[in-house]
From Swiss-Prot:
Entry keywords, A to Z: Disulfide bond, Ion channel impairing toxin, Neurotoxin, Secreted, Toxin, Voltage-gated sodium channel impairing toxin
InterPro entries noted in UniProt: LCN-type_CS_alpha_beta_dom (IPR044062), Scorpion_toxin-like (IPR003614), Scorpion_toxin-like_sf (IPR036574), Scorpion_toxinL (IPR018218)
PROSITE patterns, A to Z: LCN_CSAB (PS51863)
Organism: Centruroides villegasi
Function (record text): Beta toxins bind voltage-independently at site-4 of sodium channels (Nav) and reduces peak current and shifts the voltage of activation toward more negative potentials thereby affecting sodium channel activation and promoting spontaneous and repetitive firing. This toxin is very toxic to mice.
Keyword DNA-binding annotated: no
Compartments in which it is found: Secreted
Superkingdom: Eukaryota
Tagged with keyword Secreted: yes
UniProt GO molecular function: sodium channel inhibitor activity; toxin activity
UniProt name for this protein: Beta-mammal toxin Cv4
Matching SMART domains: Knot1
């Protein structure tokens, strides 16, 4: 599974500026999901890869980013 990492409180994606390989996104994806997850900056948000099927990613149901 793949997807954008999401803030559970506001429903927003984790923003990033440096597209492509990005240490911030990689670190956040691994902290949120697990150490074998991958992550990079895609369309100015952190995209996580190699996730388990039940991983919660953007968009959250009934939560819009404000």
């Amino acid at each position: 599974k793949e997807g954008y990492i999401v803030n559970y409180h506001d429903g927003c994606k984790y923003a990033c500026v440096k597209l492509g390989d990005n240490d911030y996104c990689l670190r956040e994806c691994r902290l949120r999901y697990y150490k074998s997850a991958g992550g990079y900056c895609y369309a100015f948000a952190c995209w996580c890869t190699h996730l388990y099927e039940q991983a919660v990613v953007w968009p959250l149901p009934n939560k819009t980013c404000n």
